[in-house]
């Protein structure tokens, strides 16, 4: 018989803050746009669970992605649903704050013990939340998951070029 998969609950930042006092254990937070999600994202999320008891994944909102790379490929609701199905994820926080390209407000509100980053995010120059983590006493762990071999932007560019060739043959 196959094992039943329980999806992690998806909630707003305020909903998580409301239940935070009842959560016991060493809390780890990781974040990303996950648009589209790829094996590097999954490796970072799964590996993040090794740094604590409770894993919260903050999914950056559509404004963040629009500001970073244009129109999102997948909307926030869809990206949260996919992340909630990944093994080891305990909570998914849909995080949408316009005019902010960081998750500093989420870190301040959630107060995890650890903040993990994967890929090429390695120091204060590449992690805008670094100083806030130091201020709040949150340990930053870098290099989580696989090295930077996947890129959402590259995946989308390849997809676009294939579609272009399909409709506009040479």
PLM region spans:
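Nucleotidyltransferase catalytic core that binds NTPs
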Residues: 1-170
